[in-house]
């Protein structure tokens, strides 16, 4: 009943899960990458693969609501080692997930059509250099 009172704008970026992607594009980019299992940073990695493929529409829909059960696949496992997905993403793509979402996906901004390549600004370059330095010191 209260769910209908929630009102968000369509936004740039992605809900991250679930995704609506054609089977051809899914197969072309290889779907989710196993190195991110059980899911930490698997969505940004998938979105980066889509970006590299030339996809520029990443749209979160206002009237689409998802309840995330939160770590349901790992919550009850004993001796579970948490995936270091953010580190894996940094090593794989040379930038943090936060940088990718901010500068490429423009996450959480109002949807206004297909995305463009990031604007190369002083702030962008400093942020990217910071990612590269962080990558060097990340194990």
Model-based region annotation:
Residues 50-51:
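Hydrophobic residues within well-ordered alpha-helices
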Residues 80-84, 99-139:
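Non-catalytic, C-terminal membrane-associated alpha-helical segments of glycosyltransferases
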Residues 2-24, 28, 76:
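A recurrent flexible, glycine/aromatic-enriched loop bordering the glycosyltransferase active site
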Residues 17, 46-47:
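Short, hydrophobic alpha-helical packing/hinge segments within bilobed ligand-binding/sensory domains
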Residues 1, 36, 56:
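Conserved donor NDP-sugar-binding/catalytic core segment of glycosyltransferases
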Residues 39-45:
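Acidic donor-binding loop at a coil-to-helix junction in glycosyltransferase catalytic cores
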Residues 24, 45, 88:
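Active-site phosphate/pyrophosphate-handling residues
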Residues 37, 59-78, 88:
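Active-site donor/metal-binding and catalytic loop motifs
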């Amino acid at each position: 009943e209260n769910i209908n009172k929630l009102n968000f704008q369509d936004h740039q970026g992605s809900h991250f899960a679930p995704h609506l992607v054609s089977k051809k594009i899914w197969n072309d980019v290889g779907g989710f990458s196993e190195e991110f299992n059980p899911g930490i940073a698997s969505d940004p990695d998938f979105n980066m693969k889509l970006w590299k493929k030339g996809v520029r529409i990443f749209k979160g829909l206002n009237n689409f609501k998802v309840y995330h059960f939160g770590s349901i696949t790992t919550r009850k496992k004993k001796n579970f080692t948490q995936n270091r997905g953010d580190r894996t993403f940094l090593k794989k793509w040379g930038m943090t997930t936060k940088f990718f979402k901010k500068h490429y996906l423009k996450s959480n901004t109002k949807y206004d059509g297909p995305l463009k390549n990031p604007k190369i600004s002083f702030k962008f370059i400093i942020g990217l250099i910071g990612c590269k330095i962080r990558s060097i010191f990340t194990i």
